[in-house]
Amino acid sequence: MERVARKLFTDLDAQKNFCEALIAESSKRTAVAWINEASNTPSFHVDSAEKPQWIPEWIDITGAEEQPGRSSEHESGKIYCLDPSSVFALAPLFSLLANEVKDEINLIIDMCAAPGGKGIVSWRNFKPQLIVANEVMNKRTAALISNYKRCSIAPSMITSCDPGLLASLVSAVADLVIVDAPCSGQSLLVKGMPAPGAFHRATIALNERRQRRILANSASLVRPGGYLLYATCTFSIEENEKNMYWFCKTFPDFVTLPVDTLAEFSSPHGRGDSYRLFPQHGYGAGAFACLLKRSGVAERLPIDERVAQVVSSVRPMWSAGVATG
């Protein structure tokens, strides 16, 4: 833990604050995403004073004493609850909406989708013609399907493909690919969960290699002019900024994009536009986010043809609002 802290912060007080925040009891705020229209009279208390600018108006923040996950709104699929730091990781996508790119995002592929939060919030943000939620670990797909069903996310497909297989089935089809990558899970400590070996060099190196493989396969899924969001819930530079440096060097047709609402969270460790939320900021367990755009617009297939290509090529475990044949 201390070794990672020294890499992240040169200031001794900052190192101390980081380590203390990792093991301190979390504020346990909850972010509540309204799947359709937000209620003016929710059954839980909303703390509007605690809402930072990077959270859109249709996502509320509740205090630690509230339990929106046990509310009638949750049971009926009107809301999805997640850690505020997960919303931070998606903030670059909200900037696309603000920059009037919404109409360009019609096909989304979420590569590491379980339990579904980032895909569901992205669907709410863009309302695409199709979202594909992929989860390679079969034991995690039950929760993913359950959440998509409960929130009535459609048109949607849930798949369980290795990233390499998915990349071999379809190419250059997605307007947006989300890679919320499996990682060393260092932020689990903030949630009071065990994270054995999360700060060990071998664990970090293993995840770095795994993340690069997922990123490499994800790159081929992005259509020219499309976007890729890379996010983790860990703190090691190797799994975050170094991966982005490697990715941009390996795939020079991708460039990082600035996110104005996250300017104060800009990472000092990256050469591009990447952003970090730490547990000492008080909004959840922590996150890293970087948004990239693929250059080019030539030979871009119409969205209907791209959706048809995905539907005909990829066999889903579950789907809604899609004629898969």
Regions found by a protein language model. Give the residues of each.
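S-adenosylmethionine
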Residues: 1-325
